[in-house]
From Swiss-Prot:
The keyword Mitochondrion is assigned to this record: yes
UniProt family annotation: Belongs to the class I-like SAM-binding methyltransferase superfamily. TRM5/TYW2 family.
Chief location: mitochondrion
EC number: 2.1.1.228
Gene Ontology MF terms: tRNA (guanine(37)-N1)-methyltransferase activity
Any one Pfam family match given in the protein's UniProt record, by short name: TRM5-TYW2_MTfase
Record bears the keyword Nucleus: yes
Binding site for S-adenosyl-L-methionine: 197, 235-236, 283
Top-rank taxon, per record: Eukaryota
Protein name: tRNA (guanine(37)-N(1))-methyltransferase
Keywords: Cytoplasm, Methyltransferase, Mitochondrion, Nucleus, S-adenosyl-L-methionine, Transferase, tRNA processing
Catalytic activity of the protein: guanosine(37) in tRNA + S-adenosyl-L-methionine = N(1)-methylguanosine(37) in tRNA + S-adenosyl-L-homocysteine + H(+)
Species of origin: Encephalitozoon cuniculi (strain GB-M1) (Microsporidian parasite)
Amino acid sequence: MDVMDDVKSVLCLKALEASNERASDCIQRAGASIRKIPRIPSIIRVKKKYSTFRVLTDTSHDLLVLVNEGFSDGEYVPINVELELCYEYFTYSEVLRRILPEEVQTPSSFEIVGSIVHLNLDGEQMKHKNIIGRVVHDKTGKTVITKIGQISNAYRSFDLEVIGGDPVLETIHREGDILFCIDYRSVYWCSKLQSERAILAGKFKAGEVLCDPFCGVGPVSLPALKKGCRVYSNDLNLRAIECLEKSIKINRLDPRNIEIFNLSANEFLEKMAGRKIDHFFLNLPEHSLDYLRRISAWEGNPLVHCYFFCRSNEDVVQYIFSRTGLRVDPGMLKVVRKVSPSKYMYKLETSSLFLRRGLG
């Protein structure tokens, strides 16, 4: 027997009985007393088969009009009605609260990327991963994954396990007015940075030149390209580059305005030497600072948007100096988000001229 067969509940309500011919009159008399219940119609057609519940009460009438307790009318007398709520009625969290052991917390949030639901299950939840994956898949219709390892490679991808739905993890995700091709198993994507990406894209102007040494699948390169910028995009991860190229086609963007490279960042920046750049976007937080000194010497005074991690117990200005030999003004820094109890992501925004002035 399927455990989901036991996920049901009986709801006792008051309702008015009516024929199809008297439906309008009955509804009008009930008026403001018609009862509203989430995911259940206030007017139930007795002969209709509903996927989320079934009527247990026998009636010879065509309709049941749900009303609040205490409703009184001279012509229509409320009757007691029982509805059996089925598995399909309940939300994923309601189902899991019913079937998981009491000591196991129901996953309270998840990230949706295209056709994929990304959970981060803890130790106790992992013991019940298959049932959790099945329920979330049933309720969303999407593939369900959970992370089983930390980001530990140059591509910033992580080990994961499919616990519900189709194991194919290439998906199309919409962010704003752009569609992104994402191979979730092989590339890095963080929806939590969506608002930050929108802020950054708002700073680009048509005709400007963006250099993106760690472009990934293009969360910044593509918006810049769509705004009419000239874009130089690079990533060491070939799969990310393949996804970026697919996204350019999907969004019908002009490929003549973007040059794409599959090189190390150092090799890429060597190729860029001498080219006019208006914006450098550095988003490889563990290593972005390592490239600041090189960019500080860039001609033309480009703007630098550099994202990096720093532990909460460190002086961030001193940390930058220890990594780069550059002294920066605290006004150039902004906290983007807290990534762990002891680590923050920061953004450093300045120009190459100001970076040169900070040379130690």
